[in-house]
Amino acid sequence: MESILRKDIWQIRSAHEGGGRKREMQEKKYTIRAMTTEDYPGLYALWMTIKGFGIRSLDDSQEGVERFLKRNPNSSVVAVASDGAIVGGILCGHDGRRGCLYHVCVREDYRRLGIGKAMVVHCMNALKAEGINKVSLIAFTRNDVGNAFWNTIGWTRRLDLNYYDFTLNEANITAFNQ
């Protein structure tokens, strides 16, 4: 894998050989950059392709994501293929004390190319630049692919905590992709 860091943009060339048999090497080019509000249609389209992905009716609406990006303008990221399609994304923000990653995803045919790790590094660097020293995320226990990813890149699964939430707006319904 060849990586070139230019300011805040990563251009990564990856050769990918799929399946258990030899195939013609296929080069997939992509760029990692800060997310903008204009990315929402492509990001939403990506979310809809991810099996088991939970979409919240208010928080994950265009208005909800725009509000999140306004509060956290420099830390969220997308991976964009050479054809302009969004193939990865992370909503990343902080409360002044701890960072949090939301909706970390990579399109299935772009996985295992280093995109996920490069996006996480981008987010962690953005958080460090804002004086944040710790970051967390939530991964569903049934998300085998995601949990394997976090273990592989060295994140610590906390067994000493319980996670609680409370829905303030009952209209903010979560629907899971099938």
Question: Where are these predicted regions, by residue range?
Answer:
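Conserved GNAT acetyl-CoA-binding A-motif
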Residues: L127-A139
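Conserved acetyl-CoA-binding loop of GNAT-fold acetyltransferases
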Residues: N151-D160
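Conserved N-terminal entry element of GNAT/NAT acetyltransferase domains
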Residues: I4-R6, W10-I12, H16-E38, E170-Q178
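Conserved beta-strand-loop-alpha-helix junction that forms the acyl-donor binding cleft
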Residues: L137-G146, D165
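Acetyl-CoA-dependent GNAT
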Residues: Y30, A34-H103, H122, A126, ...
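A short, internal acetyl-CoA/4′-phosphopantetheine-binding micro-motif in the GNAT/acyltransferase core
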Residues: V80, V104-R111, A139-F140
